[in-house]
Curated annotation (Swiss-Prot):
Substrate binds at K121, R270, N271. Its EC number is 1.1.1.8. This is Glycerol-3-phosphate dehydrogenase [NAD(+)], cytoplasmic. Signal peptide: none annotated. Homodimer. The lineage of its organism: Eukaryota, Metazoa, Ecdysozoa, Arthropoda, Hexapoda.
Length: 350
């Protein structure tokens, strides 16, 4: 890429806006990048004014990242194709349910030699059973390579500039450097690995475990029980990758995308928080999303459903009792208090 690299961020929620702070600053500071970074923003009206206009005038996403200034070179664009058409790097950071539709809109409208990177923690149901990784959907639809970025990265803490690490999974070494340059900052340290599938699967599965941690918090079962749920969750994550994505490295689970992300999400993430409220309030997950998340969606429950679909197809539900129980609690087939009985005789204990 001899010419300057154009960057587009597809998405402007809490995490998309937080990452825009880093990407915008790096694009402005580093000579290999075009300074102007476009950010696709789903248009909404806030107090009678368009959200894109507010962002471009005040350099703040007042809906999803209030109190944090975005770099002035990050430009909000309400039209997806317009935002993405000149991009050499497309950063996807939207709820995973939107990806197939967005890809359809972008097909044939982007540079043929562009690359993508997905920051999306979740996956889709494949036709005929199984799981479709978001990076695979993007590559299949857009005919471009897609890396992934996952880690212990709570959006508000990243926006505050607190130190953290992240993992980029990139199977093609030639893209590793430009992606690291784009995301690396003093407070946001990047490790690039080639085991992209395991990196991405970790990012999705940990949201299921975080729901379990939230149920434990809501039931006031204490730190020992929560630690057991986190450990069993990690073991099921490793086993899941082993079964469905053989050839992944165990060492990947010890990167930020694995155990670190699992810990932070089970103590600080929205999946944990809403799951705790699900136990204590008796309200539905849908109602709690509206109340607590400002219209944003949880990734844990739909991911648990997609994973359960896959496990059921292979007759493996009993080998993953934690994932199975969390799915059943999220869909009201079990009560939260039944969680511990479901994992008391975990295969790990046999």
């Amino acid at each position: 890429m001899a010419e300057k690299v154009n960057v587009c961020i597809v998405g402007s929620g809490n995490w998309g806006s937080a990452i825009a702070k880093i990407v915008g600053a790096n694009a402005a500071a580093l000579p290999e990048f075009e300074e102007r970074v476009t950010m696709f923003v789903y248009e909404e009206m806030i107090d009678g004014k368009k959200l894109t206009e507010i962002i471009n005038e005040t350099h703040e996403n007042v809906k999803y990242l209030k109190g944090h200034k975005l770099p002035t070179n990050v430009v909000a664009v309400p039209d997806l194709v317009e935002a993405a058409k000149n991009a050499d790097i497309l950063i996807f950071v939207v709820p995973h349910q939107f990806i197939p539709n967005f890809c359809k809109q972008l097909l044939g409208k982007i540079k043929p030699n562009a690359i993508a990177i997905s920051l999306i923690k979740g996956f889709d149901k494949a036709e005929g059973g199984g799981i479709d990784l978001i990076s695979h959907i993007i590559t299949r639809h857009l005919k471009i390579p897609c890396a992934v970025l996952m880690g212990a990265n709570l959006a508000n803490e990243v926006a505050e500039g607190n130190f953290c690490e992240t993992t980029i999974g990139c199977t093609d070494k030639k893209y590793g450097k430009v992606l690291r340059d784009l995301f690396q900052a003093n407070h946001f340290r990047v490790v690039v690995v080639e085991d992209a599938e395991a990196v991405e699967v970790c990012g999705a599965l940990k949201n299921i475990v975080a729901c379990g941690a939230g149920f434990v918090d809501g039931l006031k079962l204490g730190d020992n029980t929560k630690a057991a749920v986190i450990r069993l969750g990690l073991m099921e994550m490793i086993r899941f990758v082993d079964v469905f994505y053989p050839g992944s490295k165990l060492s990947t689970f010890f990167e930020s995308c694995g155990v670190a992300d699992l810990i932070t999400t089970c103590y600080g993430g929205r999946n944990r928080r809403v799951s705790e409220a699900f136990v204590t309030s008796g309200k539905t997950i849908e109602d709690l999303e509206k109340e607590m998340l400002n219209g944003q969606k949880l990734q844990g429950p739909p991911t648990a459903e997609e994973v359960n679909y896959m496990l059921k197809n292979k007759g493996l539900e009993d080998k993953f009792p934690l994932f199975t129980a969390i799915h059943k609690i999220c869909t009201n087939q079990l009560k939260p208090k039944d969680l511990i009985d479901c994992i008391r005789n975990h295969p790990e204990h046999m």
